[in-house]
């Protein structure tokens, strides 16, 4: 009772009108407030290890969540009775599908979007993290260590580029090197392999364009980079090749639950009757858990904006670079040259406690596997679970902040930017577990950073739990036709002249360049759309083989891509969308065009 009274006082200090209760050993908050930041603050104030989690049902006055549902409504999947229904086609759902495809199971993956990897998975920096910012007691720390070690083999099997580039924490002050014993001990506690101090001479061998103020760095070689959307697409295609049904434009609308068991799942494409449900629904994971009667957590979306620079600036980063979050590097560093003392510096920088409260790594200057440089992200709490908007103020702030890490970049180098949302819980940890109140569900929720890194390890546990549950009725047999390897679409830009010649002789479509910026051929586009998970949209093809991701952002190749997709699908160009059903590119022919039949 003392702990609950403490929570109640903390919440009421922020918002006296909020009702606080203990239900099923969860702290439940209800009420209505005028400020979203206050809603989030109340949720954080209610966190306690003595309870299962925080269910924050405080609403924002005047705000109503608008869910982006697909236009389609039919009975395509009505009456289906899969062994496993995976809800969510992000990195978590796709990796789980990949693992379950090894077994003789009827597995369905449903995704409400028009493609896999359209949520948080495609809207992040693609870092395979080392975990220096975590603590050993976190669930996500354990999965990070295991997942990081699995990436080389996983990406080789999926034929997806992975680079173990390492992560740098640059040093501005001489005294930062004195922290080596502490940082070294902390890295051992966190099981980070190979972390070491490097001086400026060695730093320049790895990062020739390193900022002038960097005296050295803490280097963590186990950090890496992957294209999160290409990996997710490969995993989904691989699962489909091995028998998993990937169902796009399919939204879960409700569930029928009796005696702690999910009996049926209602979607816009019919009612499904699964034996087991796996909840990997990203920012909607708490909504799905609530439908299933198994909710012990709340997702509060945290938006982050990332910036992509032109490839001509690709030499500015070969790893991911940042500084210690509590170290202040002055904007006029060329004048001060690191002469400020330790106490003065720490007073100007963020405290470690403040850094942890922001719940973000602070972003950085990051090398990508496609040889662009990525800047960001920032972190903004928002009420909308699908807020992908960007704003110039945030973009300028990110560029200004990261210019301290790499002073050779500028606004003129920016070619695009995008926003994504971290599906954070108030406990700031993953919820990966079997159902507590509902027996035939597995929760994979709260998967914010480092979710890309942890996905392979999380999927292993989910696979084990699924087999244990399904095996109670009958032994699950191995899929004898399982193929562990996936072949991705060849990328012309990465090939030698000899390799290109050989490929073009086999398939002349590879000799027709569609996207000049990224050197993407018609053959690549056709092979991408003819895959096990075909998606006839411009953005889906962009994620798979990159037409439109260069300097001109599709200004040259866009119309040709639309034409190729229309021809391949056998439809008019007006029917090809940029992304979802609502993102129309061409509405109709012009009057003159209609008359001349163009």
Give a label for each model feature.
Residues 240-252:
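A conserved beta-strand/loop element that lines the FAD pocket in flavoprotein oxidoreductases
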Residues 79-109:
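N-terminal Rossmann-like FAD-binding beta1-loop-alpha1 element of flavoenzymes
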Residues 102-123:
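Glycine-rich FAD pyrophosphate-binding loop
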Residues 2-7, 23-28, 32-33, 37, ...:
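C-terminal catalytic lobe of FAD-dependent flavoproteins
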Residues 126-206, 360-363:
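Dinucleotide-binding Rossmann-like beta1-alpha1 core, especially the glycine-rich loop
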Residues 255-261, 266-376, 380-389, 493:
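Flavin-dependent oxidoreductases
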Residues 25-26, 161-169, 204-242, 262-264, ...:
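Helix-loop-beta segment of a Rossmann-like dinucleotide-binding subdomain
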Residues 135, 140-145, 172-180, 218-237, ...:
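Short beta-strand to alpha-helix junction loop
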């Amino acid at each position: 009772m003392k702990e609950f009274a403490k929570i109640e006082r903390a919440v009421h200090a922020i918002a006296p009108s909020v009702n606080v209760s203990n239900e099923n050993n969860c702290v439940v908050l209800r009420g209505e407030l005028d400020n979203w930041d206050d809603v989030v603050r109340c949720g954080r104030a209610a966190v306690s290890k003595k309870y299962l989690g925080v269910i924050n049902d405080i609403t924002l006055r005047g705000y109503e969540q608008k869910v982006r549902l697909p236009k389609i409504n039919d009975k395509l999947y009505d009456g289906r009775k899969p062994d496993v229904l995976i809800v969510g086609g992000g990195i978590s759902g796709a990796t789980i599908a990949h693992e379950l495809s090894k077994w003789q199971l009827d597995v369905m993956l449903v995704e409400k979007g028009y493609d896999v990897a359209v949520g948080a998975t495609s809207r992040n920096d693609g870092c395979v993290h080392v975990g220096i910012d975590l603590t050993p007691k976190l669930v996500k720390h354990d999965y990070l260590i295991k997942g990081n070690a699995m990436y080389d083999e996983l990406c080789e099997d999926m034929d997806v580029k992975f680079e173990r580039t390492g992560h740098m924490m640059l040093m501005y002050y001489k005294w930062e090197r004195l922290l080596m014993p502490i940082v070294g001990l902390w890295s051992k506690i966190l099981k980070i392999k190979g972390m070491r101090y490097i001086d400026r001479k060695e730093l320049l061998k790895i990062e020739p364009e390193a900022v002038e103020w960097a005296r050295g760095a803490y280097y963590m070689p186990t950090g890496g980079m992957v294209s999160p959307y290409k990996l997710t697409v490969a995993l989904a295609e691989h699962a489909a090749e091995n028998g998993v049904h990937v169902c796009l434009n399919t939204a879960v609308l409700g569930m029928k639950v009796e005696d702690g068991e999910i009996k049926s799942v209602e979607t816009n494409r019919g009612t499904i009757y699964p034996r087991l449900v796996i909840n990997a629904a990203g920012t909607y994971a708490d909504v799905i858990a609530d439908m299933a009667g198994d909710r012990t957590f709340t997702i509060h979306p945290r938006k982050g904006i990332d910036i992509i620079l032109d490839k001509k600036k690709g030499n500015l980063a070969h790893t991911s670079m940042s500084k210690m979050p509590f170290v202040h590097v002055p904007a006029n560093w060329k004048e001060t040259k690191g002469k400020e003392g330790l106490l003065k510096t720490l007073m100007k920088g963020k405290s470690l406690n403040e850094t942890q409260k922001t719940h973000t790594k602070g972003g950085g200057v990051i090398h990508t596997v496609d040889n662009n440089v990525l800047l960001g992200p920032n972190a903004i709490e928002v009420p909308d679970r699908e807020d992908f908007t960007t704003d110039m103020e945030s973009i300028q702030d990110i560029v200004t902040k990261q210019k301290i890490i790499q002073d050779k970049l500028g606004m003129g180098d920016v070619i695009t930017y995008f926003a994504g949302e971290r599906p954070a819980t108030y406990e700031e940890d993953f919820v990966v577990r079997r159902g507590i109140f509902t027996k035939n569900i597995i929760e994979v929720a709260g998967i914010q950073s480092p979710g890309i890194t942890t996905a392979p390890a999380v999927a292993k546990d989910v696979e084990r739990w699924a087999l244990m549950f399904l095996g109670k009725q009958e032994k699950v047999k191995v899929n004898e036709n399982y193929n562990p390897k996936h072949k991705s679409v060849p990328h012309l830009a990465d090939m030698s002249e000899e390799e290109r010649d050989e490929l073009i002789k086999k398939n002349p479509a590879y000799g027709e360049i569609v996207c000049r910026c990224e050197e993407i051929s018609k053959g690549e586009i056709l092979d991408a759309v003819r895959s096990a998970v075909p998606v006839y949209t411009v953005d889906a093809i962009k994620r798979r083989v990159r037409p439109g991701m260069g300097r001109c952002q599709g200004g040259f190749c866009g119309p040709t891509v639309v034409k190729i997709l229309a021809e391949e699908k056998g439809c008019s160009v007006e029917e090809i969308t940029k992304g979802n059903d609502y993102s129309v590119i061409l509405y109709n022919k012009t009057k003159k065009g209609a008359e001349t039949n163009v």
